[in-house]
């Protein structure tokens, strides 16, 4: 009951007629609340927002449409299923007469634009498209009556695009289970004989009794790997014969796409330890991606972006043997980030486990999966050294770009035993797009030992959200007379579909 009151209060505040513009931070908070509470919350939110959309006050309607747009793009299947319901859609198009008038107002134009986006992303490019068929039906009916729908803006829908999607069988199963539970709850709520019959069939699927209608997630995951393999081979063919067409349009974009796949493969390898056959396929594909990316980086077809094109180190748990390509790549990254004896300006960062037999610790990538948003070309990494002061005096920001901020905070230090612990925090500085696929790499001198505890917080950092993800970093073997710890770091992430790379040198204060 309290969550319902909170939700209603937030929606009223976000769509207040005295707001001069949409409150993006509050809209994102409402979307987070819907995702967190689940249950009946998506339905309540959809109907509350719909009521505000149909307000007689155009300001309230306009703000409600912006809130609805944020919720659709940041919430998952449970909310999408509600906006595809007959009750919601009938209320949504109630503003429109049977036949179009000569001139649409701003509210109606925005609604047509949103309906076209939903049709494109939910009815044509979604695994559960059959559950959203009413959106397509209402769109076709309005088109038949003469309504003209605007072209879909690629930048606007990029956050919902399934581009570069690679999920393991377990992830696909979890995604479907969440969708089935949300659909089952709604069918039981309606309670018509037809809905109850469908709910009964759905419960058999959830329980695993109806194997005939249960997806083979292993086959789906394997098909995704084969699709990526085909793309990699096509890029390899392109290097020999430029008449071969690439899905991404340019070689740089194609290589960028392969890099994103490689990051996701590294994450899945860390999590997957049961299906040995699937693990071997991942390792084989990972080796292929490394080879193709390396060939591209040495090709004359790419002139300026070779640093970004170079492949990432393969990250696998100790039970998976590293390939020769992995060793070669680690060496290239170590050379790139080799520590020098030059003084550096203070500034902190993020690490992993370190062997003591090298002048520099091995780099280990820490990837976090997130959503996408806008199209962008390959970016060359920029080099940052100076620490940027944070508004919180206990935090030191080692990176503060227009989309990602990384800060560190010393949480514990024992100089007598040579131990220090840091909290590394990730924030999204963008007010438009979420940040995803963060891969942070750190190098330290061989005398230090590093331990990174498991990632906590948001995998997808919503626009404007501060300190949404955290890592705890423990460092040992610190000399007793040390006043700071010198490191070099490299980070890459995705803001929308735009891949960013930064690298720098920092000092962690003690």
UniProtKB/Swiss-Prot annotation:
Record function comment:
May play a role in the regulation of membrane traffic through the trans-Golgi network.
The cross-references to CDD domains, in alphabetical order and at most eight, read: GAT_GGA_fungi, VHS_GGA_fungi
Q: Where is the GAT domain?
A: 177-301
Which top-rank group of organisms is this from? Eukaryota
The GO molecular function terms of this record are:
phosphatidylinositol binding; ubiquitin binding
The record's Pfam families line, in alphabetical order, gives:
Alpha_adaptinC2, VHS
- Name the PANTHER family for this protein: ADP-RIBOSYLATION FACTOR-BINDING PROTEIN C1F3.05-RELATED, ADP-RIBOSYLATION FACTOR-BINDING PROTEIN GGA1-RELATED
Record-given protein name: Probable ADP-ribosylation factor-binding protein C1F3.05
Keywords assigned by UniProt, alphabetized:
Golgi apparatus, Protein transport, Transport
Q: List the SMART domains.
A: Alpha_adaptinC2, VHS
Looking at the record, the residues that make up the VHS domain are 14-150
Q: Which Gene3D superfamilies match?
A: 1.20.58.160, 1.25.40.90, 2.60.40.1230
Where the record annotates domain GAE, the positions are 391-510
A Gene Ontology biological process noted in the UniProt record is:
retrograde transport, endosome to Golgi
Q: Might you report a single GO cellular component term?
A: cytosol
Organism whose genome encodes this protein: Schizosaccharomyces pombe (strain 972 / ATCC 24843) (Fission yeast)
Q: Where in the cell is it found?
A: Golgi apparatus, trans-Golgi network
